[in-house]
Amino acid sequence: MEPERSQLAPEEVPDSFRVETPAAMLARLRAESAAKKEAARRAAMPYNDDLLVGSELTYLAKDDVFGCGRSALKRLFSRPSAEENVVVSHPLSVKEQVVRYQRPRTDHDPYVAVYTPLPHITEEQARKLMEKGFSNSSNVALDMAVQSHVGQGTPLLAMCGIMDSRTDDPNEALQVAGYFDLGRDRCDLISLPLINFPLNKEDFDDYMRGLYLCTMFHNVRGFQNNKALCSYSAVGFDQHKETPRCIRSRVKESWEDILARNNENEFSRVQSGQNLLNAIEKERNEAIPDVGAHQFACVPPSKGTPQTSLLTSDGVIKRPNFTLPRSASTRFNMPLNMRYSGRNSVDTARHSLTTNSGGRSTSLRQDPNLLEGQGPSIDFTKIIFPTVVERNFSNPRAEIVNTIKQLYGDTVETLSVNPPESYSAERLIGRVFSTLHGSFGATDLVEGKVLMSVKIVDLLSSANLGALLLAEVLGGNLTMRVTALITLNKYTSFALKLVYDELAQLAPDATNFGVASVLPGAIFPSQEKSFSFDFNIFSMGSYINFKENEGFGRISLVALSSPNLPDQMPDSANITLEFSVVNVDTSVYNLGQGQCLDLDRFPVHVTSKSKALSGGAKHAQAEFSLNLYELGPHFNRFQAICGHLAGYSGDLIIDWMISASALTNGRCYIVPVYDQNTFSEVSEEKLRQCKYVSKELSLNRSGTVHMPFSSSFGSYTKNKYPKLLFVFPGGISGPSGETIHVNIQVRDVLHFSGLGHQLLKPILAAEGPDPFSFHLFYLHCGTLKTESLNKGGMWCVPVSPINLAAMKHGTGSSLVFNESFVSKTHNWLHYMASCTAYWRGTLTYELRVTYNSRVNAVANLVAFYTSQVEDLFGFSDKAVGDTGIASICGDAFSVRISIPFVTPTLWLRTYRNAYDVFTSCNGSLYFHLPTSGVKSVQLFVRAESDFSFERFRALKAEYT
C-alpha cells in the first residue's frame, strides 16, 4: 500500500496554479511575439519556401562567405604560376588543394584519376549564412579558379567532376563535370554551372562535407610521381533564381548557352610543345576529341569528407610516412603512391633537413625496415602473357586438392604424412624455436669479419621441427625473424651488420667486406641490447636434384668497424641469436613486380666503409660519395643494372649510424651535397642559414634519411653523383683517445628511372623506349675460330641465360671461340643471370652462318631440342635421331628456335658456387652445322616476354 502524502509533487501541480517568475514571463511573451511576426512575414512574401528567405533586396555577396578574392578579369589574364607562389583567398591552405600526379598501379590504365576534397565553408561562415536567411536553393552555380603547374603548351587534357560520397554508384555520384586544358595560355578559370545542391538546414553540413572533386587526366606522359599538375583556389557558390528580381542570375537554358560563354574572347592557344619554339597553334574552342568511355571508381561512402588514399576525415591530404618497425623485413610489399621518410627527411630544393616529430628529436629506437633485400622480380614487358606452365605451377598444392575433390566429392580427406611430434608454422608463429650462442674477442673486430654464422637448413631440420614446417616451406614462402643479443659495457661501441646470405657466399670464418657490403642486411651498433630483422626464405619448388635445401642460405653477423675504445673492450663477448617464425605464405609464384627501368622502389643495399673520426674540439667531418656505379670486389643486382645505364634518377633512402661510447656527445649536421660540389670545411653559420638542424650525438646515434633527387645534369652518372656529409662543427667530446665510426647503407632508390643505354643506343630508336626490350637479340656466345669450322656434326648448347662460352664450361677442344669476343659479356642478360639466384621463362636462340660463297649454302640449317640436359657446351658427334623431342628447320643462313619453360619445377638456378647443368638448364639444344664452305658461325639469344629472375646473389667484379 502506498503511504499517504500531505502535499503534491512539483510535477503534479497544474500549470494554472503555478506562479510565473518575471523572467520566465518575459521570455514567453517574446517567443509568442516572434512567432506572430514570423507568421505575418511569411504570409506577406510573394514567393514560396524554395526561394531565398528574406526581403527581395537581400542578396549575399561573396565577401560574406568566402572573403575577398581575385576578380574574374585578373584570374582570366593571369599566367600559370609555380606551386609555391599560388595565393588563394579560401581559408583552406593551397597545399591541401594541389592536385598531384599519382602513378597508376599498372600501365594499362588509360586515365589517371586523383581525388581531392571540395573546398567548403567553415562553421563560422555557415552561421553567417543562416543569419542572412540563406535557407534553400534549387539552382546553385559554382566557379573555381584553376592554377596550372605544367609548362605552357603541354598537351594535357583534364576532366574535373564533382562527386557525392554518399553512394558508390559512379553514375549517381557524379554531379557535374567539365573539361579544361592545363596547357592553355590562360588556364585559370573554369565554371561548372547548373549544379543542384540542396542547401537546407538539415543536410547542409553533411552534404557539403560529402562532396569531393575527381580530376581525371588524359595522356599523362613523362611526369614524375607526386608532381603537382594544378591547384584549385577560391570557390564561390551563388544562389540563382529564374525571376526578374535576381539581378545576378546566370542560369542557362541549355548546354549550348553554357559553351557560348567560352567564346566571349577570341584568341588562339598553344597545344603542343614544352615551350613556344616550333609550337602548333590551334583554335581555342576546338572540338574535344573522343577519349572513350570513362571508367572510374567512387570513393567509399563515409561520414564527412570521403576517405581516400589522399584524404583524411579532416579534408587534409595524407602524406603517409613510412613507419619504421623494430624488426626489419626482406619481403617486398610496395604500396601504391607511398612516400617514404625515415626519422629525418631532406625534403626541399634548398636541402633543408627537418625532423618528423614536430621539430623535436627523439631517442626512441627505430630499426630499419629491410623490405625485399633481393629486389623485385624482373619482368621485361608491360603486358604479362600467362603460359601453361604458370597455370600448372601457380599453386601446386591447391590444384591437386581441388582435383581430388572434383573426382571423389567433398567428403574426401587428405591424410597427413607428417610425424605427430612435428610442429606446424602456425603453432610456432611469434615463438622462439631456436637459440644459438657464440662469442668473439677484441681481435675479431676487423672490418668484414664474420663473428657468427648460422645455416638455415640446420634450424629447419632440428628435432621436433623439420618435417611439417619444411613441407610448408617447399610449398610457399616462410618469413623468419632473427634477434641478436650482445652484452657489453656502455663505454664500448662498434658497428655490426646482420646479413642474410641466401647463397652462402660468406664463409663462416671469412673476412670479406666486399661481399658483406652488398648482401641484404641491416646495420646496428653494439650498444643495442637486442636487434632483429625479418627475412624471407624462398623455395624454388620441389626438384629431383634439390639437395638438402641448401638454397636457404645463412644468417651471419659481420663486424663493420673496430671498437671505439680498444682498452675498454673485454677479451671475450657473448652473442645470442634467437630465431622465430613470423609468417607462412602459400603463394609460391608470381610474374614479378614491375619494369627494370621504371620502379617505385628499387632495393640497393650497398654498405659503405666506415669513416673514423677522432675526438676533440676541432672541426670533424665524414664524407660519403654516393656513387652506386663504383664497384668493389663484388657487386649486386642494382649495380649490375646501373652498369648498362648512362644515368638514373631517383630518391635515395639511406640508413646511417654512429658508434660511440655513452659519454660521447657533439652537434652533428647531416648535409646532402649535389652536382659534384666539394666542401673541405663547412661552417656552422652557413649550415644554419641554409636551415639545417643539428642533432645531439648523445640522443641520436642512428636513423634514416630521404635524399630527394637533385641534379643540374638531369641524372646521376658514373661521374656525376651526390655526396652525404656528417659535419661536427664544434668537434666531438668524449673519453680521451676515442675514435667514433660513421656508417651508412643506401637501402633503396625511390621512383627509380633508368636513362639511356651504353651499348645499344643506335638500336633503341627502332626498338622503342625500353632499353631492356625483349625484342633485342644479344650476341651471347661469340664467333667460332677458323679451326673449329667445317667439322659438321652437332653443336650442343644447354638452355641457360648464363654465357657459357665465357665460363668455358665443357667446351672441349673441338669447339673454340675467339677469346677477344668471348670476354665481351657485358650484356644485361648475363649480368642479371649472374646477380640473381633463379630464373624461369622462354629463351629464343638464333644461329647465323656466313659462307665463303653462295654456292656453298646448299643445305638448310636445323635445330633440335630435348628436355634432357647434356653436360656439354660444344661439339657433339651424337646422331641426329638421338637428339631431341622437337626440331625446326630454317634456311641456309639462319635458324631460330624458342624454348618455353618446360622444367617440372617453379624455378631453375642460375648457378651457385659452381655451375650445375642439372639444376640450371631447361634442356639442351643441338644445331646441325654445315660440313664445308663456312666462314663464320655466331649464336644469338634473347629473353622473351615471360622471362624473369628472382632473388639475390653477389657477383665478383672480375667475373663479368
From Swiss-Prot:
Q: What keywords would UniProt list here?
A: Capsid protein, Host cell junction, Transport, Viral movement protein, Virion
Q: Where is this region: Disordered?
A: 350-370
| Keyword Transport on entry | yes
Q: How is it modified after translation?
A: Specific enzymatic cleavages in vivo by the P1 encoded 3C-like protease yield mature proteins.
**Which GO cellular component terms are attached?**
host cell plasmodesma; viral capsid
Q: Which GO terms describe its biological process?
A: transport of virus in host, cell to cell
Asked if the keyword Amino-acid biosynthesis belongs to this entry, the reply reads no
Q: Which InterPro entries does the record cross-reference, listed alphabetically?
A: Viral_coat, Vp20_capsid, Vp24_capsid, Vp25_capsid
Site, Cleavage: residue positions:
Q374, G375, G592, Q593, E767, G768
Q: Where is the composition biased (Polar residues)?
A: 350-366
Domain of life, per UniProt, equals: Viruses
Q: According to its UniProt entry, what is the function of this protein?
A: Capsid proteins VP20, VP24, and VP25 form a capsid enclosing the viral positive strand RNA genome. Together they form an icosahedral capsid pseudo T=3 with a diameter of approximately 30 nm (Potential).
- In Swiss-Prot or TrEMBL terms, this protein is called RNA2 polyprotein
